[in-house]
């Protein structure tokens, strides 16, 4: 089979961050009866489902460590590698850090897909690493039934500038740096519903580096930050709210959306991960239409940064975002938790 005829998405049962194990099932997997190992230098572990682990070196600098990998979300091998690498590197930026090195994770069905195609995937990953200013320094590969690619990434951050997903405050405004709808558009493409004018839009967004995260970390008023990926905006916002003991009020009209996303939802281009996300987080939502639910639960691959920002820092955040070509509008706010109210409400 020629490389031109290859459609990588046909060789996997899932796609991108939509491959994630559902939060409910993950809770069961991570539950342990063993005594927890306590290390006072481990600033961020898995307690709040943050984007990466952070370890204090004791000299004012902390190490950030993360890994992320998945099955193809696009058919083009180079783009798949680039998207997977960009997505993995994003975790470093989401913690406020700068990446310094990456190693590759490759699973490949050697008897089904040519090694030349795997090389193209790896080249896409190398390209993304170069964009981030780091080396793809090594990696590990296995013969696997489905194609898998991703990175383990190491970064650094001044300890006082670490941004967590659990330290938001009531009164903070919420901002999102990329539009939602990646899962919807990629599903529409698989179903041959995608219009010509929307071809390539999702890929362009997924390949956009969240490098602004390191700059946002220098703003004191950025109280919490995370990237929106496989659990959708609802899932990652819920984790932010749970960690801080606050509730969120969202303005649906102000949430950035990819062109055509509402039309494709109406046509049924909703990925399976959307329902898994709703099953895990739907009980935290207020009343909303199926269309709104489908967008908020849409699994994002290499999605944008979600920021909780104090009102006095709003102008600084917008100005910093503009330096990276990002036009920010508040999508909602955080309020004090109150009984009888949903954790996430839509206005």
From Swiss-Prot:
Record's protein name: Selenide, water dikinase
GO BP term (any one): selenocysteine biosynthetic process
Keyword terms, alphabetized: ATP-binding, Kinase, Magnesium, Metal-binding, Nucleotide-binding, Selenium, Transferase
Gene expressing this chain: selD
Main function: Synthesizes selenophosphate from selenide and ATP.
Catalytically driven reaction(s): hydrogenselenide + ATP + H2O = selenophosphate + AMP + phosphate + 2 H(+)
InterPro entries reported in the protein's UniProt record: PurM-like_C_dom (IPR010918), PurM-like_C_sf (IPR036676), PurM-like_N (IPR016188), PurM-like_N_sf (IPR036921), SelD_I (IPR023061), SPS/SelD (IPR004536)
Cofactor, how bound (note): Binds 1 Mg(2+) ion per monomer.
Gene Ontology MF terms in the entry: ATP binding; magnesium ion binding; selenide, water dikinase activity
Site note Important for catalytic activity, residues: 20
Species, as recorded: Salmonella typhimurium (strain LT2 / SGSC1412 / ATCC 700720)
